[in-house]
Amino acid sequence: MQKHTPSVSCSPFPSSHKFYQQSLLFPNVRVPLRKILLTDGSGESPFNVYDTSGPYTDENVIIDITKGLPAIRIPWLSERADTESYPARLVKPEDNGFTHGKDLTPVFEKKRPILRSKNGKSITQMTYARAGIITAEMEYVAIRENEGLIEKNKQHTTSSKAFDASIPEVYTAEFVRNEIACGRAIIPQNINHPECEPMIIGRNFRVKINANIGNSAVTSSMAEEVEKMVWAIRWGADTVMDLSTGRNIHNIREWIIRNSPVPIGTVPIYQALEKVHGIAENLTWDIFRDTLIEQAEQGVDYFTIHAGLKLAFIPLTIDRTTGIVSRGGSIIAKWCLHHHKENFLYEHFDEICDIAHTYDVSLSLGDGLRPGSIADANDEAQFAELKTLGELTQIAWEKNVQTMIEGPGHVPMHKIKENMDQQLALCNEAPFYTLGPLTTDIAPGYDHITSAIGAAMIGWFGTAMLCYVTPKEHLGLPDKNDVKTGVITYKIAAHAADLAKGLPRAQLRDNTLSRARFDFRWHDQFNLSLDPDTARAFHDETMPKEAHKLAHFCSMCGPKFCSMRISHDIRDAVAIKKTRDEGMAAMAEKYQQNGDLYMKVMPSIKETVDD
């Protein structure tokens, strides 16, 4: 038993409060949004923003991670009446890496029914969409993407080149349904993760970001990983992947899922490898299949499956600078070479789809041959695998399984567009999910920046979700601070992409913050930013007093050199001059029109002399 309840970050954002937008179609659908309150007298209305933080920033909710979050989707699932509960698979010693005794992470004690589709029923969001059915989940994400508005606000958009995307001015549940039906978008929502707030991944919606967490064989605990998840979603992570590779994988994952309001993804091959003591050659389909069912019953929303790495592609990596850098890809390659057999994930892909279909788990087809250096970008191995992923996507779609495609990696800027073009062509517009890409290899410790450059570009070109990179990339396991840095960096990249592709409302936040900056409304600047805490802390390092928040300058320029203060002076001077000039012009016109009424006619000088 636990001696105490671990605490997590659960305070509201400054000058913000959570509110819930009621659906007009579904009485039991209420969509959470965050309202940022701006300075009284500013003339600005409160500003609504998309919110991923779940109940953790709702001051009216009491958080207890031993109980988990409310199961908001249970009523929706019950109304559809196409799922059933059944006895769960028993937890085995190998599920937690053979950990026992005091080293075993406590079991999450609050039990819930395990669901699966009823025999003969298809319960995926793609099935409903293709049948013309609008689900509560589809309505939920439409409201969420609109940030609660039903009409597009006017804005000044600097660019709207969306590279053949079809972005509506207002999202509707019908638009969402159509995007899912044709495979251009997914709503990753395992029926066994009812705590999850629906979100959508697709190129015609706002660009999403994923944050990776997870323990390793040498570090981290359940409390740390739950806190990392909560911390990541506070700052804007749309999904979280649990990439745990050490002990207690099963129990830690249960704690994470029960307390997560965002979709949770995994790479099942990692846990399967732990079950065979880390010996890749000992992996079997039966072990992997059992792992998929274990994770699906827990509520994992999407699986990364490295089924596109075929035996014939492995020789294509021999002359690479950095070989195979994907952990999952290297595991599969080692198994294939040892057994001289085709990838068992490729061979059993039909069965993988059947399992995913039973629980509405989305598939994220892994890029096991992604380039790990810019020298290897866009090579034959990478695109051979991508072509295979496109073929596997068609198989998944035939079974109504929602699918997205994973992408690179390390790619210099001039080669990024080709990646997007190839993916769209080979994978029939299935959502693209990329790791960066990193645009240079010379900056260990700063790869959150090298990758954000590529992420912003490929997001503009059409990538639907960006996997964050932290400063610890290539160096170590990220801690809580690294997670925040990675998430904020990728929120910037995603927002920059949304601006470039002309997403409705994207520029409104920029415009609102810019007005606050020009008006020296310091608190509004802080509160409208992605990271209010850091913005306020940087300002207060040199001007900490509350009176400084009313100053019309900061420590960068001081009062005499502040360009915005000078701009205000120029505006005031121009306004005064304009008023004065307009007054003088009006008087001149008046004199010209009626001068004879005010001026005495004087005799000429000559007439005066003659007299």
Curated annotation (Swiss-Prot):
<dbReference type="GO" id="GO:0008270">
    <property type="term" value="F:zinc ion binding"/>
</dbReference>
<keyword id="KW-0784">Thiamine biosynthesis</keyword>
<dbReference type="InterPro" id="IPR002817">
    <property type="entry name" value="ThiC/BzaA/B"/>
</dbReference>
<dbReference type="InterPro" id="IPR025747">
    <property type="entry name" value="ThiC-associated_dom"/>
</dbReference>
<keyword id="KW-0408">Iron</keyword>
<feature type="binding site">
    <location>
        <position position="562"/>
    </location>
    <ligand>
        <name>[4Fe-4S] cluster</name>
    </ligand>
</feature>
<comment type="similarity">
    <text>Belongs to the ThiC family.</text>
</comment>
<dbReference type="Pfam" id="PF01964">
    <property type="entry name" value="ThiC_Rad_SAM"/>
</dbReference>
<feature type="binding site">
    <location>
        <position position="306"/>
    </location>
    <ligand>
        <name>substrate</name>
    </ligand>
</feature>
<feature type="binding site">
    <location>
        <position position="406"/>
    </location>
    <ligand>
        <name>substrate</name>
    </ligand>
</feature>
<keyword id="KW-0949">S-adenosyl-L-methionine</keyword>
<feature type="binding site">
    <location>
        <begin position="367"/>
        <end position="370"/>
    </location>
    <ligand>
        <name>substrate</name>
    </ligand>
</feature>
<feature type="binding site">
    <location>
        <position position="241"/>
    </location>
    <ligand>
        <name>substrate</name>
    </ligand>
</feature>
<comment type="pathway">
    <text>Cofactor biosynthesis; thiamine diphosphate biosynthesis.</text>
</comment>
<feature type="binding site">
    <location>
        <begin position="326"/>
        <end position="328"/>
    </location>
    <ligand>
        <name>substrate</name>
    </ligand>
</feature>
<keyword id="KW-0862">Zinc</keyword>
<feature type="binding site">
    <location>
        <position position="270"/>
    </location>
    <ligand>
        <name>substrate</name>
    </ligand>
</feature>
<feature type="binding site">
    <location>
        <position position="433"/>
    </location>
    <ligand>
        <name>substrate</name>
    </ligand>
</feature>
<dbReference type="GO" id="GO:0051539">
    <property type="term" value="F:4 iron, 4 sulfur cluster binding"/>
</dbReference>
<dbReference type="InterPro" id="IPR038521">
    <property type="entry name" value="ThiC/Bza_core_dom"/>
</dbReference>
<protein>
    <recommendedName>
        <fullName>Phosphomethylpyrimidine synthase</fullName>
        <ecNumber>4.1.99.17</ecNumber>
    </recommendedName>
</protein>
<dbReference type="GO" id="GO:0005829">
    <property type="term" value="C:cytosol"/>
</dbReference>
<comment type="function">
    <text>Catalyzes the synthesis of the hydroxymethylpyrimidine phosphate (HMP-P) moiety of thiamine from aminoimidazole ribotide (AIR) in a radical S-adenosyl-L-methionine (SAM)-dependent reaction.</text>
</comment>
<feature type="binding site">
    <location>
        <position position="554"/>
    </location>
    <ligand>
        <name>[4Fe-4S] cluster</name>
    </ligand>
</feature>
<feature type="binding site">
    <location>
        <position position="212"/>
    </location>
    <ligand>
        <name>substrate</name>
    </ligand>
</feature>
<dbReference type="Pfam" id="PF13667">
    <property type="entry name" value="ThiC-associated"/>
</dbReference>
<keyword id="KW-0004">4Fe-4S</keyword>
<dbReference type="GO" id="GO:0009228">
    <property type="term" value="P:thiamine biosynthetic process"/>
</dbReference>
<feature type="binding site">
    <location>
        <position position="557"/>
    </location>
    <ligand>
        <name>[4Fe-4S] cluster</name>
    </ligand>
</feature>
<dbReference type="GO" id="GO:0016830">
    <property type="term" value="F:carbon-carbon lyase activity"/>
</dbReference>
<keyword id="KW-0479">Metal-binding</keyword>
<dbReference type="GO" id="GO:0009229">
    <property type="term" value="P:thiamine diphosphate biosynthetic process"/>
</dbReference>
<keyword id="KW-0456">Lyase</keyword>
<feature type="binding site">
    <location>
        <position position="474"/>
    </location>
    <ligand>
        <name>Zn(2+)</name>
    </ligand>
</feature>
<keyword id="KW-0411">Iron-sulfur</keyword>
<comment type="subunit">
    <text>Homodimer.</text>
</comment>
<dbReference type="InterPro" id="IPR037509">
    <property type="entry name" value="ThiC"/>
</dbReference>
<feature type="binding site">
    <location>
        <position position="410"/>
    </location>
    <ligand>
        <name>Zn(2+)</name>
    </ligand>
</feature>
